[in-house]
Each structure stands twice: as structure tokens, then as C-alpha cells.
């Protein structure tokens, strides 16, 4: 037997704080919790909702920092300080090798923050080779992190870093950038939706991650807000320093991911709409030529991999090298 129902109601909420109030009023059956609400519940075993918690499944998207290499100010002039900084390899390496994001991850999974860590441009489970090996495991091997396992304590990319190595990398970046006129701290424009307390708290925690990782003399998040549309108000005017965005698989092949960041392809979504690297490549300044050369090499590797259509294993290996 089955029982029928007349309708299903979907409630649109402004942020999770409002959603929690609706849940308490029994107007919602389930809800994702903000970090502060989750902390309140888990710190009190007698809390009425303490036994109603469950860890939600990982997102199906691969979330990444997407740098903007052609950042503009609100008046339409180039944000030269950021553009020079982000074109520098040592500066970008500091993000990958020295930025501790565990407090930021805790905003999305308070209990097991490092389950939010993403080490690959492609999400897990997209495709497997003939031996049943996940494509991202092939990427891990190329990155030299295939032996690193989840330990719940340390981000994978930080395990080979030391305070001295990061200090040296930071000094290298600052020396190289000072030589071309960059002033410090470099302000990284980062936007969140106005009126959303959870988004504001997320951005504030992320800003603190930069402070804790590098100090305030190197990189600082310059927080800004948009009213309703990130695309219309931030991305299209090219105001962002970087955007955190997730990409899911439209089809089960690595080109669905890495193909979004190549040059000379108007369909490369991230290259055209987020990083704006194609605009830089048209007439790169001296400080951008190494960056463009790296993208050219990456583009060649992706195109070479995409041309392999008769050997799936070789295709995946080639994409992993890219």
C-alpha cells in the first residue's frame, strides 16, 4: 500500500540562519547547518537536535580557486597590482603550498573539515581506466601525492611544506614582485552576496585563513558584496581577484574539466569567463609572458590528450600529465 500526498512545498531561504528557524518551527524536514549552529548543537549533548545530526554526502562538484589574470577596478582601469602579483609563479605557489584552509572547510563540515579538501581539477569518480583506477589517482601520481592518505589533520598539499619553506617562497614572491612595482600587501578582491550572514561569515573566515597563513604584510582579502548576480555584478565586469566555484561532469571524460581552461578555444568556459587568460594572451606584458607560456604548454598537452580516441588508458594518462 502507499499513501498519496497532494503537494510538495519547496521553501527558498535567504540564508541558513533563517532556514534553522524554519526547521525549529517544523516548516522544513531537513536542513544544512551553518558552522555556528552546528557548534551550538554538538557542544551540548542535551540539545534537542543533538541526535538528529547526520553527515551529508560530499558534493559532486570539484571546487577550485579560479584566478582572474585580467582584473579591473570599478572604473574599468586595470588592477595592475593584482594582475602583476597573480601572474607570478611564486605568488601562486603560496596559495597551493602555504594556505591552510581547514578553518574554512569547517564552515561546510565542522566535524570532518578535511573531507572537503579537493586536490584535483577533476572531481573523483568521473572515469576509470581499464584497471579500475580512478582518473584522479593518475593525477595524484603525477603530482607526487599518490601515497598521501586522508588523516583528518593536515591538508595534503601542506604536508611537504615547512614554516621555513613557505617563508622562503613568500620572500621570493615579494622580492620578484617588488622589482616590477607591486606594493604590499596585495589586495585580492573577493565577493560574496550581500545580506547573507552565512556567506559573510564564510568570507570572513577565509580572510582570516590568509592572515594566519601568511600574515597581513603579503596577501589580504579585499571583501566586497554583490546584490543578486555574481555574473552581472562581478564576473563580467572582471572585478574579482579569484572566485571559488564548483564544476560537475556533463559527461565522463577529463576533457570536460581541463578543457575549460585552455587557450584558443571560445568554448573554454573558465578561460573565457573567469580567468580571462585569453585576453592576457592577446598582448601579454613582460611580467605575463611566463604565465601565458605555461598556459600554452597546458593547452598543447590537453589537445594532445584529447586527440587520443582509440586508447582510453593512454588518453587518461595523457590528461593526467596535463
Residue ranges and their predicted role:
Residues 9-75, 102, 106-108:
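Extracellular/periplasmic solute-recognition and catalytic clefts
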Residues 86-212:
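Append "and occasionally in soluble cytosolic enzymes with long acidic Gly/Pro-rich linkers
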Residues 20-21, 39-43, 65, 74-78, ...:
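Extracytoplasmic/secreted cell-surface and envelope-processing proteins
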Residues 23, 28-30, 47, 209-273:
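Periplasmic binding protein-like
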Residues 3-5, 47, 55-77, 81-86, ...:
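Short, solvent-exposed loop/turn segments at the edges of secondary structure
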Amino acid at each position: 500500500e502507499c499513501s498519496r500526498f497532494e503537494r510538495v512545498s519547496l521553501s527558498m531561504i535567504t540564508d541558513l540562519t533563517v532556514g534553522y528557524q524554519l526547521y525549529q518551527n517544523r516548516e522544513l524536514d531537513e536542513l544544512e547547518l551553518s558552522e555556528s549552529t552546528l557548534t551550538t548543537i554538538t557542544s551540548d549533548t542535551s540539545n534537542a537536535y543533538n541526535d538528529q545530526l547526520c553527515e551529508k554526502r560530499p558534493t559532486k562538484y570539484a571546487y577550485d580557486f579560479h584566478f582572474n589574470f585580467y582584473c579591473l577596478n570599478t572604473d574599468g582601469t586595470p588592477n595592475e597590482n593584482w594582475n602583476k602579483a597573480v601572474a607570478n609563479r611564486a605568488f601562486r605557489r603560496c596559495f597551493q603550498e602555504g594556505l591552510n584552509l581547514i578553518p574554512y572547510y569547517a564552515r561546510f563540515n565542522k566535524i570532518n573539515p578535511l573531507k572537503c579538501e579537493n586536490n584535483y581539477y577533476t572531481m573523483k569518480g568521473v572515469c576509470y581506466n581499464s584497471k579500475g583506477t580512478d582518473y584522479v589517482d593518475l593525477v595524484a601520481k603525477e603530482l607526487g601525492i599518490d601515497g598521501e592518505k586522508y588523516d583528518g589533520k593536515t591538508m595534503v598539499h601542506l604536508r611537504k611544506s615547512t614554516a621555513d619553506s613557505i617563508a622562503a617562497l613568500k620572500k621570493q614572491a615579494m622580492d620578484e614582485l617588488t622589482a616590477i612595482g607591486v606594493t604590499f600587501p596585495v589586495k585580492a578582491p573577493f565577493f560574496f552576496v550581500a545580506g547573507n550572514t552565512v556567506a559573510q561569515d564564510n568570507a570572513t573566515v577565509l580572510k582570516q585563513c590568509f592572515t594566519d597563513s601568511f600574515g597581513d604584510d603579503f596577501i589580504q582579502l579585499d571583501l566586497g558584496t554583490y546584490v543578486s548576480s555574481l555574473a552581472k555584478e562581478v564576473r563580467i565586469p572582471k572585478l574579482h581577484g579569484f572566485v571559488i566555484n564548483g564544476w560537475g561532469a556533463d559527461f565522463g571524460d577529463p576533457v570536460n574539466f581541463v578543457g575549460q581552461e585552455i587557450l584558443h578555444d571560445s568554448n573554454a568556459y573558465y578561460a573565457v569567463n573567469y580567468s580571462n587568460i585569453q585576453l592576457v594572451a592577446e598582448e601579454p606584458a613582460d611580467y605575463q609572458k611566463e604565465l601565458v607560456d605555461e598556459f600554452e604548454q597546458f593547452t598543447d598537452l590537453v589537445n594532445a590528450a584529447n586527440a587520443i580516441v582509440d586508447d582510453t588508458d593512454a588518453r587518461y594518462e595523457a590528461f593526467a600529465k596535463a
